[in-house]
Amino acid sequence: MKSYLLVPKESIESQARVGPRGTEQGERVLSRTTALRFAVANKAPDTLFALGLRSATLPGSRPPVSGQEERRRKGKGAKSAGTRGADASTPPMPGATVAEQTGAEPGSYRYMPLIGATMAHFYEDHTEKEARGELERDFEFIPDVVPLSFPGPVSAGQPGPRNRGMSSLAEREWPDESGVPLAHAQGIRGAGVMLGILDTGVDADHPEHAARVIQFRYVSLFPNSPHNPARDIRGFDPDGHGTHVCGIAAGVHHGVAPEVDLYVASVIESETIRTSLGRVAAGMEWLLHQFSRPENSTRPAVVNLSLGFPLMPPPGISEADYNLNLRALQTMIRRLLDSNVLPVVAAGNSGPDTVGYPAAFPESLAVGAVDFERNVATFSASGTVGRRGVPDIMGYGVNVYSSTERRCNNQAFYERMSGTSMAAPYVAGIAALYRCRAPDLTALEVRDLILSNAVKLPRSGTHKTGKGLAVFR
C-alpha cells in the first residue's frame, strides 16, 4: 500500500518560504483572509471515486460528484468492473462503488476540503498510475512517509498530590508577572474561545477536565469506512502527554484559560510517539470543521501543536520527499491562519542552533521554554531561518505542574514535566485570554499583542529568546 497527500499545486509553495518576518511591519504582510478555496481541489475526490477508491470523507459520506465527473465515473466504472471480472449484465447496486460490487478494493481516500487536500491510500499500483495520469498535472502527490512526533518531556516528571483540592493551584503555579492571576480576578478566563489541541488525546474523566464537555476525535491511521464512521466518544489518552498539555492550557483548576471550549484530536500514538502528515491533516480538518459550524463560525480560536518533524530526513527518506512533506505542512499551518485561527507551536527540545518544523514556518507562533526564574531552559531549541530568529516568544516550560492520565487505581494524577511541549500550551492559554478579552481581534493582531506585551529577557549567549516571556497585560 502507498499513501499520498494530494495538494493542489496552486495552493502550495514551490519551497518552504522564510516569510516576511524581520521587519517592523512584516507580520502584517501575511494573509488575513478567510479559509482559501481552490476550485481544482474538488477534482481529486471526484477522480479517485471514479477509479473505485472507497470514500472515507468525514463524516463518512461520499462527496458530491460533478456532472462531468459522474459521466467519467460511469465510463471508467464499467471498464474497471470488466477488468475485475464482474458480470457486465449484472445491474449495479444502487449507490455502490465498483469495489463494493466486485469485492475488490483498489484503495481509499479522505477528502479534506477545509485544508484543501485529499489523503489517498492505493492498494494497487495500476490504480495509482491511473490516478497520477488524471491528477499529476494539478496536484502534488506527497508521500506520507516522514514521521512526526511530539518533542517529548525532557524529564519523566515529578509526582504531585493526588485527589487533593486544586482550587488555588492556578494562583500558586502561575507567577503574578504572567498576568494569569489578575486576568482570572477580572473574570477573563477564556470563555467563548475555542482551543484546539493536536496531541496524544486527553483523559476526559480526570478532575481537571471532567466538569466540561470536551469535543474529542481519535484520528486513525487509515480512513474509516463510510458504513462505519468514526464515533464521537469520551476523550482518552494512553500516554499522558496530551492530558498534561490540555491541563496547562485549560485545566479547570490550574489552567491558564480554564473556561475555553476544548477540542482535542488524538493524532499521536502512545506506543511509538509518532504520527504522520496524513493524520495531522485529518486532525486539522476536523478542528476546522468544528470551528466552522454555524454556532462557532464567528468565535475566536487558537490551536496548540506540541509536535514536529525531525530536523533532518530520517534514514530511508529522500530529501525531496522530506521537503515535500514540509511544504504540505506549511500549507496546512497557513490554512489555520487564513481561517483566523492562531497556531501556537512548540519550538523543540534539541537545544541551541537547531530549528525544526512547523515551528520554523513564519505562520507559526514558535515557543521556547524558560523556568519560573526566567532562565532559558538548556534544552529549548533556537536558531535562525533566513533573517528570522526562532523562537518568537517564550513560555514557562520547566517543571510545570499539570494533569496526566489516571493510573490503573483510578486515582487522579498530577506531575511536573519540562519541555517546549509545556511552554507552548502556556502561550496558547495566554492567547486565549487575549481573544477572550477582545474577540474581534484577528489571529495576527493577537499574535502582535502577545509579542508587543512580552517581558524582555536578559540576552543569552547561546539561545534566542524572541520578544521575551509571554504574559497577559
Regions found by a protein language model. Name each.
Residues 108, 296-307, 436-473:
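C-terminal subdomain of the subtilisin-like protease fold in secreted/lumenal serine endopeptidases
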Residues 199, 218, 356-436, 440, ...:
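Extracellular S/T/G-rich loop segment that most often corresponds to the catalytic His/Ser-adjacent loop
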Residues 58-64, 68-173, 182:
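Autoinhibitory propeptides
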Residues 22-28, 32-33, 37-39, 43-53, ...:
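Active-site core segment of subtilase-fold serine proteases
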Residues 252, 268-363, 373, 408-424, ...:
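Substrate-binding/access-modulating region of protease and related hydrolase catalytic domains
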